[in-house]
Amino acid sequence: LTILKNGVNTEWISTVNFNLRKPNFIIIHHTAQDSIQQTIKTFTLAHTQVSAHYVIGDDGRVVQMLNDYLRAWHAGNGSWGKNTDINSASIGIELDNNGSEPFSEAQINSLLALLTKLKKDYNIPEQNIIGHSDIAPRRKVDPSVLFPWQTLAEKGFGIWPDQVLEQAPTNFNVEQALRIIGNNTKNLAAAISA
């Protein structure tokens, strides 16, 4: 019950006509911190205003920090395709890694198991499993150049080229190709670097 400034009491009558958000993307990050404990502490302090749905430790430990249907604060300013509010449409997964070290086998195995569950539960298309650097090129570099995207793509998570072309086909339009897969090409150099 709330009393409004004009003295009127609000009345609560619940409805069954609502739903929670449905995640359509998974954004993969690295923590840029030195331990899973440090990341968990950062994500539980109100003043940091940063969070993720899951954190995966170097040892493969998976910590869920937020219900999948709720909006975490992991993506910040970025876009993919026409979606400019990535936090509202995605699940954020942070990998405990400072960005300069290889990702452990245990960590990647846990990530693959979690992605299998999330992709099935929410019917997330494989091309919608992307990195933070994809949605915020030049601003973010995670999950780092050491992240095994090819391994994930071979398991059905994310995309990876079947072959590397030595030369682009005649009349190939880089900007159009990047836009088709979801990149924001307002800053073409940034989109290419992502």
Regions found by a protein language model. Name each.
Residues L1-Q127:
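Active-site-adjacent loop/helix surface patches within enzyme catalytic domains
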Residues G99, F103-A194:
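Basic/polar, cationic surfaces and motifs that engage anionic cell-wall
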